[in-house]
Every structure is written in C-alpha cells, then in structure tokens.
C-alpha cells in the first residue's frame, strides 16, 4: 500500500514532498541502505540511525535530497513492519518521490530464494543469518551515472583513497543539498559538471589518469546510460556497461548491485572478496574461480549469499599483504 501524503498543489517552496507506504514484509531501513554509503561523512548518503537515512541524488538531472524514516506504529507493532516515510526537497523532489520505495528494496523479493531447494543447501550459519536479518533488502536506486562514478573511483585503490577522492571532488564541484540535509551533504554533479572537471582537480584528489578518463568516457555517454538504467535486467545492464573502456566485470557488478537490486551480480577481481568468500566456505584463501565455484549452487541469487555472509559477521584472518594507499598526485 502506498500513500502520497503531500500533493503537488499543497506543497510550498520550503516544505518537503512526502510519500508514505507500508512495506511488503519486513524491512530494515539502515541495513538495506548502508550499502550505498561510504563512511560517516559521505556527502550523498548519511546513516543517522537504524530508522533515519538521508540521501542526495538527481531526477532528470535536477537536485534532490531525501530523508527516509520509520514513523512510530501501533504499540506492539514489529519495527520492521512499520510504515516508511520519505520527505524530499529540491527541484527534482516530486518527480523522484515515486521511485523512493525501490531505493529500500520495495520490489526486492527473497521469497523465491527462501523457498528454493538451493536455500536448503546453505550452510547453517547463513540460514540462521537469514532468519536473524529478515529485513535485509537489495536497493534499486536507478541512478546509474552516480553509482558509476563511485565504482570507478574505487578501482584498484583502497577504500580510504576512494572515499577521500569522492569527497574532495564533490566538495569542489557539487552544489549543497537542498532542504535541511545534514551539514556537508551535496548533490552528485551532473554529467556536464563532471565533464568540466579540470585535470588538476583529479590530480589533487589523488585520482590517476586511467580512472578520471573512465569517468569522462562514461559522462560522454550519459544520455545512453540514462536510457540503459531503465532496462530491468541487471545482466543486460552489466554487459552494456562493459562496452565502455575502463569498465570491467567488477565495476559493472558494483554498479548494478545498487542500481538494479542485482541478486546475482558478483564482484570478481575484487581485492578482498574472493578470499573473504573462500575463507567462509573452505577456511582457506582462494581465487575468483574458486569463489564462483563455491557460489554456483546459488546462481541467480549469488549476491544474496554474499550479503548474508557479510551480515553473518564473518571475518577472514587478517594476515597477509595489505593494499597500501597510493599518492598519485606526484605521478
């Protein structure tokens, strides 16, 4: 059930547009949206609590900031079943608002997976994790260009480097979030703004020429990618994304996991993921090939299995070489 609380005619310039709905089944707001964030000071996604998340985005290239909350329900109501309220500000708010339920996985159904024979083959710790985290959903934001920039900046570097670069580039090139968004939040740049980013800014942010060139190539195909974002098949989207030089299987999977709620996309060539998954199943490090072999029984739902492993609290041993931050500003 969905209910638009504030109509177009009733909304004033400074009042938010609102959308409230009852989720189908349990929903954990913070756990579902956390995958979109990059640290506590992310300029485009702030998790302020399990039931309060701020995001910024664009709708038809118009700025939007939005706050997801869970209004208090009837006494005794399971918190995972309470309504979701979204309040949005900015020129793109009313157009974006009907897409808000997809951001928290409203169309993501685990039912086929939960009732499948493959689910019964999951290791017991993952079955237990699924029962302990019934509100975990896969978000489908649809913001292909925005997620592409995040994924490209994360190529071949540490998370610290990527986060630092993203924050700096948005601080220099992005406009402040509309409405009462938390301090420091900004709206992702438009394709035109990215294309105008001077080379010295990429350099100063610590982004090497290969990654900045990939962002530029992506933004030069912005119109085509905005159409591609409407394709509901994440596998087709992954394939199409890889036609852009500099975007491979890892980057494409990282994008569609967030934009399309991709239940099967696996981030191969990730510096940590193969070992992480292999340690869970084999209690030993392993290759991408071994990871895919281990996940094969759950094809069609492999990303769900990866999310369950992460939600289980599994940690692989921390010995071995670490990827150290690199300073590309002197290259």
What residue spans do the PLM features occupy?
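HhH-family (HhH-GPD) DNA N-glycosylase catalytic core used in base-excision repair
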Residues: 1-331
């Amino acid at each position: 059930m969905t209910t638009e609380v504030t109509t177009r005619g009733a909304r004033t310039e400074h009042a938010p547009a609102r959308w409230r709905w009852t989720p189908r089944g349990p929903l954990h707001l913070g756990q579902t949206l956390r995958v979109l964030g990059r640290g506590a000071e992310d300029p485009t996604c702030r998790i302020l609590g399990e039931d309060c998340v701020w995001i910024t985005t664009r709708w038809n290239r118009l700025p939007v900031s939005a706050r997801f909350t869970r209004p208090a329900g009837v006494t005794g109501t399971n918190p995972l079943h309470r309504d979701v309220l979204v309040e949005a500000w900015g020129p793109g708010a009313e157009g974006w608002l009907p897409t808000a339920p997809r951001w928290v996985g409203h169309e993501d159904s685990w039912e086929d997976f939960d009732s499948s024979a493959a689910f019964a083959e999951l290791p017991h710790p993952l079955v237990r994790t699924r029962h302990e985290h019934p509100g975990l959903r896969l978000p489908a934001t649809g913001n292909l260009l925005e997620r592409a920039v995040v994924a490209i900046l994360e190529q071949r570097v540490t998370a610290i480097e990527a986060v630092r670069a993203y924050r700096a580039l948005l601080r220099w090139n992005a406009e402040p979030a509309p409405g009462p968004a938390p301090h420091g939040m900004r709206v992702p740049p438009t394709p035109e703004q990215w294309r105008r980013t001077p080379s010295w800014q990429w350099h100063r942010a610590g982004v090497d020429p290969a990654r900045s060139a990939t962002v530029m190539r992506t933004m030069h195909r912005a119109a085509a990618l905005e159409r591609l974002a409407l394709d509901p098949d994440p596998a087709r989207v992954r394939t199409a994304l890889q036609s852009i030089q500099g975007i491979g299987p890892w980057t494409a999977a990282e994008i569609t996991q967030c934009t399309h709620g991709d239940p099967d996309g696996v981030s191969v060539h990730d510096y940590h993921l193969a070992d992480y998954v292999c340690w869970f199943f084999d209690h030993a490090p392993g290759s991408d090939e071994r990871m895919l072999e281990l996940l094969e029984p759950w094809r069609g739902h492999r990303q769900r299995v990866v999310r369950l492993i992460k939600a289980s609290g599994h940690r692989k041993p921390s010995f071995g070489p670490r990827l150290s931050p690199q300073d590309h500003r002197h290259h």
